[in-house]
Amino acid sequence: MFWIVLIVILLLALAGLFFVRAQSEREWMREVSAWQEKKGEKQAELPEIKDGMPDFPELALMLFHAVKTAVYWLFVGVVRFCRNYLAHESEPDRPVPPASANRADVPTASDGYSDSGNGTEEAETEEAEAAEEEAADTEDIATAVIDNRRIPFDRSIAEGLMPSESEISPVRPVFKEITLEEATRALNSAALRETKKRYIDAFEKNETAVPKVRVSDTPMEGLQIIGLDDPVLQRTYSHMFDADKEAFSESADYGFEPYFEKQHPSAFSAVKAENARNAPFHRHAGQGKGQAEAKSPDVSQGQSVSDGTAVRDARRRVSVNLKEPNKATVSAEARISRLIPESQTVVGKRDVEMPSETENVFTETVSSVGYGGPVYDETADIHIEEPAAPDAWVVEPPEVPKVPMTAIDIQPPPPVSEIYNRTYEPPSGFEQVQRSRIAETDHLADDVLNGGWQEETAAIADDGSEGAAERSSGQYLSETEAFGHDSQAVCPFENVPSERPSCRVSDTEADEGAFPSEETGAVSEHLPTTDLLLPPLFNPEATQTEEELLENSITIEEKLAEFKVKVKVVDSYSGPVITRYEIEPDVGVRGNSVLNLEKDLARSLGVASIRVVETIPGKTCMGLELPNPKRQMIRLSEIFNSPEFAESKSKLTLALGQDITGQPVVTDLGKAPHLLVAGTTGSGKSVGVNAMILSMLFKAAPEDVRMIMIDPKMLELSIYEGIPHLLAPVVTDMKLAANALNWCVNEMEKRYRLMSFMGVRNLAGFNQKIAEAAARGEKIGNPFSLTPDDPEPLEKLPFIVVVVDEFADLMMTAGKKIEELIARLAQKARAAGIHLILATQRPSVDVITGLIKANIPTRIAFQVSSKIDSRTILDQMGAENLLGQGDMLFLLPGTAYPQRVHGAFASDEEVHRVVEYLKQFGEPDYVDDILSGGGSEELPGIGRSGDDETDPMYDEAVSVVLKTRKASISGVQRALRIGYNRAARLIDQMEAEGIVSAPEHNGNRTILVPLDNA
């Protein structure tokens, strides 16, 4: 019946499979015919069909594989079942073969080890057959157990369960060597597995935990209660107490000694102040050494322990005495002798009354465990006799009577009129001498010499205030406010370190006839103040908080990580315009990788530009300079009020602005010694030059610093026209500018000759020599005077600063000659006190040549348009990433790392105020030769400027021209046998000397020297 059902199932499965296949083929043919009708194509154009139809659909394939798998496993199961069933039915009483017979053909372990190389295939075959036989036997036994059939006991079966000879072979197995840590870990793992298995078995068997038995507090009924008076208990207690008496006394001593020390302080010796101060330190140090050492009385008193055994014995004696309740009074001396060593001295002997037996605080009780000992009773009262009153009392000193202060009679100061009425009448002829030496433009000195100061001081005395009078000439300050006075000499020029003599001296000096010979300038102390400038301006919204800096630091790290550049922001500095973040690249990250991401990082952070500082001097990190969302306005008054500018003693101090942290930046032009400023239009170049000029005007008087200004644009520097610091009017014509530079070269040569004669190395040494001679009342004559018999005296030489606003226009006008003059001044003019400030908006190589750059090491670069311009100015990149509006890079001489500075803003209103303030103190003293150029009409600076050496054949050429009466280049060339260029220069020199005229329209020249003079 079973076989019939199985066959029917197989047939149905096959029929279903064929039905699905036929159905799929029918559907496929229907789709093909529909496709043919739609496309209208021929049968030949259809794709080829394999086996009449395409592949099965997915559902058919899945069904086919499922049926195939089911049929396979069903067939395997039926075959196994039939085999087992037929085997048991055919041989129900088949005896189990002996195990020894089955193992006879199986090779042992020793056989395998001995003959491992021979007969490998035979051994494998025998092992396979033996394994099949054992499997069959085991299966028979298992089948018998399942069928509940008893198997008769057979010794062969028992022998089969015993270990074989190969298993108890003397051959040692090969063990794996492991470490102790691995073995411990394996044992722990095995223990955990065993515990887990035990708990799992208990859970599967539904084992319940044994309930805990609650112990009753009351004894069971019928038991005998043993009290404290039981003889056995008392005997046991006595033996235990005697055995532990020594240990207990020592432990009790440790517990009661602090109480004894606290309640009976008079029982100890006197404690020194030093020991009392050291006691807390000893107690703190003793906490880690045990309770006994920390609580000992000698440590409490700040004393060192020298003999530990003696102290321990003393403790034991004290503990024994404390347990004797019959003693009511204990001698203090005896107790102290037991507590401290014999070497200690005892100060004071008084008896301390101990409490009685009923009030004994050390009561003996028996504990619940049968151990007794003294226990401290907190409820007991303690009575200690008060110490005796001291023999001497501290007596306060008697009160000091108050002594009334004696009245001091101070004479009132004399009235102002008495001070100002002390006048001095100069000797005869003094006024004429002074008038000849003082310039006519010095109105202040004229007023003083004419006696105008007496009228003003009298008006001040009548009014009663020093600042009440004003000059009738319209000056801002009065005489007394500008110059000051004292009780010994009243002179408006008293504190003025200048070259001109003071107009009034004290009476003593007048009697002695001590008149300073050095001239003093009246305007030396008329320096402008910061009141003329706009006050500082601070915008609190432009400051960045710590949270914003931290957020930007995290953003920088994340954005650089996106470009596979790992860095860490270590610090940040927030300034008025930018914020610098110092980053430390990770190990293996090059600095160029951060530099190449400059524009990408700026775009990612949403800022206009980022400047990457590859090297920060003194640090091991790089720098990222990001612009602030809002920038601060830096006023010029903020820099002038700073200590850096105020404490600078140089007359050529330049205020540049603030650095990235907001600190003022000032420099000394005398140490520069020349300055090159370059930047595009609108970068703040002209404003920076104005700030530098105002810095020198605020620091130096006209007798200290003189200026020559060249302004091709006629707008920037023309505002300074008329200030007393100018040597010449502001030059706006470039042809005259070359003359000014030529005069500077001649002045430089003149000063070098004077310094060589004086034996000094710079201008400061020369001026010091002049000042020392004037202090001695001597005068130094000019060694190069045109009148050697009566030479004019040498005077103090001021610094000369040449400011050129647009250097490129000057280079285009004069060209090569201007470059030579600038190079000569840059090379040699430093020691002569002549300094250059060159500014240009076209930083190209034809303007800033290599010769100029080599001699001007100090440079300032404002914002430029390209990296090439930045390299032209600074010899490195970075200026193209500046922000404009005064943002600059300042390169100091001798350094390769420029400093970023934010320039101070000088408005036109501030410049006008300072100029008007300076104009009121006098007209400038111009030098006419600066712009005239000696009256020559040719290109200034090109004719004879600098040609101090005359051609040795010049006289012969003049003689030839005068004899022949022909001024031709070819005639001079033939007569002197020289080249054309040299002959042409000689003719040009004759024209400059006025010997021949300029060439006419036909090229002929007329000899201007008469024949008689020839």
Curated annotation (Swiss-Prot):
<keyword id="KW-0238">DNA-binding</keyword>
<feature type="region of interest" description="Disordered">
    <location>
        <begin position="89"/>
        <end position="142"/>
    </location>
</feature>
<comment type="similarity">
    <text>Belongs to the FtsK/SpoIIIE/SftA family.</text>
</comment>
<dbReference type="GO" id="GO:0015616">
    <property type="term" value="F:DNA translocase activity"/>
</dbReference>
<keyword id="KW-0547">Nucleotide-binding</keyword>
<keyword id="KW-0472">Membrane</keyword>
<dbReference type="InterPro" id="IPR027417">
    <property type="entry name" value="P-loop_NTPase"/>
</dbReference>
<feature type="compositionally biased region" description="Polar residues">
    <location>
        <begin position="298"/>
        <end position="307"/>
    </location>
</feature>
<dbReference type="InterPro" id="IPR041027">
    <property type="entry name" value="FtsK_alpha"/>
</dbReference>
<dbReference type="InterPro" id="IPR018541">
    <property type="entry name" value="Ftsk_gamma"/>
</dbReference>
<feature type="transmembrane region" description="Helical">
    <location>
        <begin position="1"/>
        <end position="21"/>
    </location>
</feature>
<keyword id="KW-1003">Cell membrane</keyword>
<dbReference type="InterPro" id="IPR050206">
    <property type="entry name" value="FtsK/SpoIIIE/SftA"/>
</dbReference>
<dbReference type="InterPro" id="IPR036388">
    <property type="entry name" value="WH-like_DNA-bd_sf"/>
</dbReference>
<dbReference type="GO" id="GO:0005524">
    <property type="term" value="F:ATP binding"/>
</dbReference>
<feature type="domain" description="FtsK">
    <location>
        <begin position="662"/>
        <end position="871"/>
    </location>
</feature>
<dbReference type="GO" id="GO:0007059">
    <property type="term" value="P:chromosome segregation"/>
</dbReference>
<dbReference type="InterPro" id="IPR002543">
    <property type="entry name" value="FtsK_dom"/>
</dbReference>
<comment type="subunit">
    <text>Homohexamer. Forms a ring that surrounds DNA.</text>
</comment>
<dbReference type="Pfam" id="PF01580">
    <property type="entry name" value="FtsK_SpoIIIE"/>
</dbReference>
<protein>
    <recommendedName>
        <fullName>DNA translocase FtsK 2</fullName>
    </recommendedName>
</protein>
<keyword id="KW-0132">Cell division</keyword>
<dbReference type="GO" id="GO:0051301">
    <property type="term" value="P:cell division"/>
</dbReference>
<dbReference type="InterPro" id="IPR036390">
    <property type="entry name" value="WH_DNA-bd_sf"/>
</dbReference>
<keyword id="KW-0159">Chromosome partition</keyword>
<feature type="compositionally biased region" description="Acidic residues">
    <location>
        <begin position="121"/>
        <end position="140"/>
    </location>
</feature>
<feature type="binding site">
    <location>
        <begin position="682"/>
        <end position="687"/>
    </location>
    <ligand>
        <name>ATP</name>
    </ligand>
</feature>
<dbReference type="Pfam" id="PF09397">
    <property type="entry name" value="FtsK_gamma"/>
</dbReference>
<keyword id="KW-0067">ATP-binding</keyword>
<feature type="region of interest" description="Disordered">
    <location>
        <begin position="497"/>
        <end position="525"/>
    </location>
</feature>
<dbReference type="Pfam" id="PF17854">
    <property type="entry name" value="FtsK_alpha"/>
</dbReference>
<keyword id="KW-0997">Cell inner membrane</keyword>
<keyword id="KW-1133">Transmembrane helix</keyword>
<dbReference type="GO" id="GO:0003677">
    <property type="term" value="F:DNA binding"/>
</dbReference>
<keyword id="KW-0131">Cell cycle</keyword>
<feature type="region of interest" description="Disordered">
    <location>
        <begin position="281"/>
        <end position="318"/>
    </location>
</feature>
<keyword id="KW-0812">Transmembrane</keyword>
<dbReference type="GO" id="GO:0005886">
    <property type="term" value="C:plasma membrane"/>
</dbReference>
<comment type="function">
    <text>Essential cell division protein that coordinates cell division and chromosome segregation. The N-terminus is involved in assembly of the cell-division machinery. The C-terminus functions as a DNA motor that moves dsDNA in an ATP-dependent manner towards the dif recombination site, which is located within the replication terminus region. Translocation stops specifically at Xer-dif sites, where FtsK interacts with the Xer recombinase, allowing activation of chromosome unlinking by recombination. FtsK orienting polar sequences (KOPS) guide the direction of DNA translocation.</text>
</comment>
